[in-house]
Amino acid sequence: MERAEQQLRLFQRVSRLMTRDLELDDVLQEIVSLVKDFLTCDSCLIYLVEDGELVLFASSDQNRKTIGTVRLRLSEGLTGWVARERRLLAISREAYSDPRFKYFKDLPQDTFEAFLSVPIISQNKVVGVINVQHREPRLHTGAEMEMLSTVGEQIGCLLVLSRQKQQAPTSVG
């Protein structure tokens, strides 16, 4: 299957997840799995803004005890930089040596070489960040950057739908 077809299939799967009656945590967890498979990356993480901090909400890593416990200010780390600057960040090698890098003892981030991150924007506000990481150096393509940006936009829409669902009266049927 052509890469463009695979990308379209990924977007369709994310869109279908958005329409299912699932908890937000479950949808985000499924999205990190889909992105990890598509990009053949070693790690995919989704952080959401909560009380002015970025909180880890979904992780493709085996150690899920870090979900909800890893928190960083918008001024911290590569992830905080992406949120603060509202810009994509792609580092092809030695991401751990970037001066913006922040080490977390509970995350194996210092073992990753390549890093790709995009802000999640909803209603013109940064509401989170999605990161992918590779253990080996990797120059991300423009298509990969665009794909992750689009998934970030879909997550932004998902968060709007999730808020509406919480506020809406229950319907029959």
Specify the residue positions occupied by each region the protein language model found.
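Short beta-strand-to-loop transition segments that serve as allosteric relay/switch motifs
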Residues: 62, 129-138
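Allosteric cytosolic regulatory segments
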Residues: 149-156
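Signal-transducing coupling segments at domain and membrane junctions
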Residues: 65, 92-114, 134
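Helix-loop-beta substructure at the N-terminus of cytosolic sensory domains
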Residues: 20-57, 66, 76, 162
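Signal-transmission linkers at sensory-effector interfaces
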Residues: 1-25, 37, 127, 161-173
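A short, aliphatic-rich beta-strand micro-motif
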Residues: 113-121
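Acidic/proline- and glycine-rich, intrinsically disordered low-complexity segments
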Residues: 51, 65-89
